[in-house]
Amino acid sequence: MTNAVLNEKNHSVTSEETKKERVRILAPRVDIYSDEENIYLLADLPGVEEKDVQVQLEKDQLIISGKTSNKDIQGELRYSEFRTGEYKRTFTLTESVEEDRISAVYKNGVLNLTLPKRKPLTKKIEVRSE
């Protein structure tokens, strides 16, 4: 009886998987560099349209994502080396950034992010004698 339940569950899972289109997750290639004022990130997202690029900042997590497909192809696809699917990559920021000043420019399949570093707050503490 136990085997029948397991087989049925496995069959259901297998059936559901075959119904869904498999989505391929791709990690975009990046270059990251910085200077005293900014962190710069360049992400290669070939084939992704600007409207499909997303950049999110959640606490110290920077998330880059986008989608590409080969929907516009006419005729029967015989051979393909183009990468299609979803791009997604998450980075943990090791420095504080000014969220309101982050800029993102997308041109020729390359996402260029500029993340201004937050200036360290220094507070002078008064020392008293007792």
UniProtKB/Swiss-Prot annotation:
Name of this chain's protein: Probable 15 kDa heat shock protein
UniProt keyword terms in alphabetical order: Stress response
Coiled-coil boundaries: none
Organism: Leptospira interrogans serogroup Icterohaemorrhagiae serovar Lai (strain 56601)
Pfam families, alphabetized: HSP20 (PF00011)
Domain called sHSP: residue spans: 21-130
Origin superkingdom: Bacteria
Gene3D superfamilies for this protein: 2.60.40.790
Gene name tied to this protein: hsp15
Taxonomy of the source species: Bacteria, Pseudomonadati, Spirochaetota, Spirochaetia, Leptospirales
Classification via InterPro entries: A-crystallin/Hsp20_dom, CS_dom, HSP20-like_chaperone, Small_HSP
Similarity remark: Belongs to the small heat shock protein (HSP20) family.
